[in-house]
C-alpha cells in the first residue's frame, strides 16, 4: 500500500514538472515572437537624397525607395521614421578604419535600416546584413552627346543606307547606264545621222544622264526614242524614291540615339582617348571596384583618378552629372542611375558597356532579426510585379517624345519594290528598242527587196559597228 502511494506521488510530481517545462518553453517562444514584433513595430530608417530613389517634397519625401519602404511596412506591419543621412554619403571606411555615411549610421545603431540605392559589396557585407537585391545594376560611363560624337567617323553621311543598299544602288546605276547605252545603239531614233554612225547616248553620256537624275534636274542628252524614254522615266522614279528615302533616313539618324554610338563605347576607349577627363564619386563602391581590380585597364582608370583625386572625384551623383553637362567630363557610376539621367536630360548618353554587375539592397546591423523577413517581402514584391511597376513609375523618359529611340539604316529589302520596278522598266526599254529595230529592218527589207533577217542583220551590224569592220576587211582583200 505504501509503495502504491509512493508511486502515485512520484508520477504526480513528474507530470507537474513536465507541464511546467512545457509551459516555460512555450512562454520563451512567445517571448521571442513578442520581441520580434516589438522590433518591427517602429523602425528608424536612413536614406540619401538621390533622384528618383529618394527626393524631398512638400509632404516630406518621395521616390522609388520611399514607395518600396511603404509597401514593405504594409506587408510586415511596422511603422517607421525616415531621415536623411547626416554626411550625405553612402558609406566607406575612412583613414582611421571607421565607416561613414549610411553604413556607419547602421553600424553605430543610430538607425535600424538603410533604404537607398546602396550597392551590395564584399566589404559592406562583412560589416552589415543585406536583404535580397531589389534592383540589379553595374558600372558604366555617362557622357555628353557632343563629346560622345566629337570623334565621329568621316563618312557619316553614308549611314542612312546599309552597305548592301549602297552596293545595290551602285549596281542599279551601272546596269541602267549600260541599258541606256545599249538602247541608244539599237533604237534608230537615237541616231543623229546613220551614215556617220553616231548616236547621242555614248556610254559616258549614259553615265552622266544617270547621275544627273539624282540631282532631280536631269542632264543632256535628252532621249528621243520610246525605248530610251521608258528607261529614263523609270530611272527618274527610282531616283526620286531613293533621294526621298535617304533624306528621311538621314533626318531620323540625326534625331535618334544612334548618333551617340561613337568611339567611346567601352572603358578601353575611355582610357585611350585624351579629350575627356573622367572620375567617379569619392569613396564610393565604384571607386573601390577600380581600386581593387587587377584588370590592367581598370587599374589605369584607378591610377588616373587617384593621382588627381581632388580634381576628378565628386561628392555626389548629382555633382557628377552636372560636371558632365557643363564640361569635358565623363562620369563613371551606376548604370541604373545613369539611365535615369539619360532619360531626363536629352543631351546625355550612356556608353553601351556595363561591368561589375551588382545589386541594390536594404542594409541592417549584422545581428538584426529583420533581414529574413524583409528579404521575403522584397521577393514577394518582385514576384507580384510591384517592383517593376514602381520602376516604370519613377523612371519616366521625358525625352521619348523628343527623339526617335530606335533607328536602323535602310536595308535592300525595304527598297525591294522600287528595285523590282526598275528591273521591269529596263527590260521593257530593251525590248522596245529591239522592236523599233525590227520595224526599221522590216521597212528596209520592203524597200530594198531583201529578207527581214538579212535587213535585221545589217541594221544590227550598223548599230554595233560590225559592218564597217567587214567592209574594211573586204576592201583590204580587193586591194
Curated annotation (Swiss-Prot):
Cytoplasm in keyword set: no
Chain's role: Receptor for glutamate. L-glutamate acts as an excitatory neurotransmitter at many synapses in the central nervous system. The postsynaptic actions of Glu are mediated by a variety of receptors that are named according to their selective agonists. This receptor binds domoate > kainate > AMPA > NBQX > glutamate.
Topology, Extracellular side: 18-163, 251-414
Signal peptide coordinates: 1-17
Positions of glycan attachment: 79, 282
Transmembrane segment boundaries: 164-184, 230-250, 415-435
PANTHER family: IONOTROPIC GLUTAMATE RECEPTOR (PTHR18966)
Cytoplasmic compartment segments: 185-229, 436-479
Family, as annotated: Belongs to the glutamate-gated ion channel (TC 1.A.10.1) family.
Coiled-coil annotated spans: none
GO biological process terms on file: modulation of chemical synaptic transmission; synaptic transmission, glutamatergic
Protein's name in the database: Glutamate receptor U1
Localisation per UniProt entry: Cell membrane; Postsynaptic cell membrane
Keywords, in A-Z order: Cell membrane, Glycoprotein, Ion channel, Ion transport, Ligand-gated ion channel, Membrane, Postsynaptic cell membrane, Receptor, Signal, Synapse, Transmembrane, Transmembrane helix, Transport
Keyword Transmembrane recorded: yes
GO molecular function: AMPA glutamate receptor activity; transmitter-gated monoatomic ion channel activity involved in regulation of postsynaptic membrane potential
Assembly behavior: Homomeric.
InterPro entries: Glu/Gly-bd, Iono_Glu_rcpt_met, Ionotropic_Glu_rcpt, Iontro_rcpt_C
Record's bilayer topology term: Multi-pass membrane protein
Domain of life from the UniProt record: Eukaryota
GO cellular component assignments: AMPA glutamate receptor complex; dendritic spine; plasma membrane; postsynaptic density membrane
Amino acid at each position: 500500500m505504501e509503495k502504491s502511494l509512493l508511486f502515485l506521488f512520484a508520477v504526480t510530481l513528474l507530470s507537474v514538472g513536465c507541464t511546467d517545462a512545457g509551459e516555460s518553453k512555450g512562454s520563451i517562444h512567445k517571448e521571442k515572437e513578442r520581441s520580434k514584433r516589438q522590433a518591427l513595430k517602429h523602425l528608424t530608417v536612413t536614406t540619401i537624397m538621390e533622384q528618383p530613389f529618394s527626393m524631398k517634397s512638400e509632404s516630406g519625401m518621395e521616390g522609388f525607395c520611399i514607395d518600396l519602404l511603404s509597401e514593405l511596412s504594409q506587408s510586415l506591419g511596422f511603422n517607421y521614421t525616415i531621415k536623411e543621412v547626416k554626411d550625405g554619403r553612402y558609406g566607406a571606411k575612412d583613414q582611421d578604419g571607421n565607416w561613414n555615411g549610411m553604413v556607419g549610421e547602421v553600424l553605430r545603431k543610430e538607425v535600424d535600416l538603410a533604404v537607398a540605392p546602396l550597392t551590395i559589396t564584399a566589404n559592406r557585407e562583412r560589416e552589415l546584413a543585406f536583404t535580397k537585391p531589389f534592383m540589379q545594376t553595374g558600372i558604366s560611363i555617362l557622357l555628353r552627346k557632343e563629346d560622345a560624337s566629337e570623334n565621329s567617323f568621316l563618312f557619316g553621311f553614308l549611314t542612312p543606307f546599309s552597305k548592301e543598299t549602297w552596293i545595290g544602288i551602285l549596281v542599279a546605276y551601272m546596269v541602267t547606264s549600260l541599258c541606256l547605252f545599249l538602247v541608244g545603239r539599237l533604237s534608230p531614233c537615237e541616231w543623229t545621222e546613220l551614215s556617220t554612225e553616231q548616236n547621242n547616248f555614248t556610254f559616258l553620256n549614259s553615265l552622266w544622264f544617270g547621275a544627273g537624275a539624282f540631282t532631280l534636274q536631269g542632264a543632256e542628252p535628252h532621249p528621243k526614242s520610246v525605248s530610251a524614254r521608258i528607261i529614263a522615266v523609270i530611272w527618274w522614279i527610282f531616283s526620286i524614291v531613293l533621294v526621298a528615302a535617304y533624306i528621311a533616313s538621314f533626318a531620323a539618324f540625326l534625331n535618334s540615339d544612334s548618333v551617340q554610338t561613337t568611339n567611346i563605347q567601352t572603358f578601353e576607349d575611355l582610357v585611350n582617348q585624351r579629350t575627356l577627363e573622367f572620375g567617379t564619386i569619392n569613396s564610393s563602391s565604384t571607386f573601390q571596384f577600380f581600386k581593387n581590380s587587377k584588370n590592367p585597364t581598370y587599374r589605369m582608370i584607378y591610377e588616373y583618378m587617384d593621382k588627381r583625386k581632388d580634381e576628378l572625384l565628386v561628392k555626389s551623383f548629382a555633382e557628377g552629372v552636372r560636371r558632365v553637362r557643363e564640361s569635358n567630363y565623363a562620369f563613371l557610376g551606376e548604370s541604373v542611375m545613369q539611365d535615369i539621367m539619360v532619360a531626363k536630360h536629352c543631351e546625355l548618353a550612356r556608353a553601351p558597356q556595363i561591368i561589375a554587375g551588382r545589386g541594390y539592397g536594404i542594409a541592417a546591423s549584422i545581428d538584426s532579426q529583420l533581414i529574413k523577413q524583409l528579404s521575403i517581402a522584397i521577393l514577394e514584391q518582385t514576384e507580384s510585379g510591384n517592383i517593376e511597376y514602381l520602376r516604370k513609375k519613377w523612371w519616366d523618359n521625358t525625352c521619348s517624345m523628343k527623339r526617335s529611340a530606335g533607328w536602323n539604316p535602310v536595308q535592300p529589302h525595304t527598297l525591294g519594290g522600287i528595285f523590282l520596278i526598275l528591273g521591269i522598266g529596263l527590260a521593257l526599254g530593251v525590248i522596245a528598242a529591239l522592236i523599233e529595230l525590227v520595224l526599221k529592218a522590216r521597212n528596209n527589207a520592203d524597200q530594198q527587196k531583201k529578207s527581214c533577217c538579212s535587213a535585221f542583220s545589217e541594221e544590227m551590224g550598223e548599230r554595233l559597228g560590225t559592218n564597217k569592220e567587214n567592209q574594211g576587211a573586204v576592201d583590204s582583200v580587193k586591194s
